[in-house]
Amino acid sequence: RKGGVQDILILERDSELGGILNQCIHNGFGLHTFKEELTGPEYAARFIEQVEALGIAYKLNTMVLDLAADKTVTAMNKTDGLFQLHPKAVILAMGCRERPRGALNIPGYRPAGIFTAGTAQRLVNMEGYLPGRRVVILGSGDIGLIMARRMTLEGAKVLCVAELMPYSGGLKRNIVQCLDDFGIPLRLSHTVVDIQGKERVTGITLARVENGKPVPGTEEHYDCDTLLLSCGLLPENELSRAAGVALSPVTGGPAVNESLETNLPGVFAAGNVLHVHDLVDYVSEEAAAAGAHAADFIRSGEQPGGPVLPVRCENGVRYTVPTAIRPGCAGDTLSLIHI
């Protein structure tokens, strides 16, 4: 809207704006953007207030079913039924999903009591349910660390947090505030090799890991009724694939140029759908840039073709965003490059 575009529509599948922030009731958000510490809902509310003040339209409880290469959006909700939109530009902001048990190849039965950390977070913080009493958490990503603290505060006993790698995947501040302050053990280079229980989890077996494989004879048993999985996030790009958006084999998100534009003219991407961010402040910065570039595209139309230079990663650099730049088009936008 600040770029001069009047007709803007936000499609949200949940019952309220804010996305994952609504279930993140812990503080630590907004230190970069607002120079103060906010909870997730407070941070989201700052932007929702801006959306309302600018008169930007949005549809809640609306599921986008398809995105075509010509930018036709097919969606549905209870009020409008099935409908199509034909925008001049689309910004992909679907976020990411947690890696489920099926992607982890953990042996054992499939009893109740196995949750991703984000699902458990929603159950506790928004639905008012406690998933279990004796908990083991696999994976030391930020969500897993935060849920170790949250479950403890709600009265559960967190037996340990196990991490496959020899280092934690979460922020140092979360290790200190969520584990150390509550006396929760962090078992590095360990993974779950078996889940016991038929109707409900009754226990799990941990083993030490070397070179990515469990070491025989190092198994340890934990009596628990709940296993939380915090084993990484995957950009949610079903719609991107349907439209023919080229995806990065490293991040799993769209491959974009310096304007955060995909290989489809007028289709942009920002946030965790592009690549997983550590801080929501960086998501906001990236989203603002994508919005500005989308507004430029609408005003000026498709940019003339020209050379596109891929960004090549050397030793020590896993990936960059953008994955390609157009000489002469970058301007100051490369200040947003992520490595």
What are the language-model segments listed below?
Residues 43-92, 97, 195-200:
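Feature captures the FAD/FMN-dependent oxidoreductase FAD-binding
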Residues 1-46, 50, 122-125, 131-177, ...:
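Beta1-alpha1 glycine-rich phosphate/pyrophosphate-binding loop at the start
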Residues 337-339:
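Conserved small/polar residues in nucleotide/adenosyl-binding loops
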Residues 270-301:
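A conserved FAD-binding loop/helix module that cradles the flavin
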Residues 96-136, 140-145, 250-258:
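Glycine-rich dinucleotide-binding loop and its adjacent helix/turn
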Residues 92, 114-124, 226-277:
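FAD-site-proximal beta/loop scaffold in flavoenzymes
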Residues 81-89, 216-225:
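Core beta-strand elements of the Rossmann-like FAD/NAD(P) dinucleotide-binding domain
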Residues 275, 295-329:
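Active-site-proximal substrate-binding core of FAD-dependent oxidoreductases
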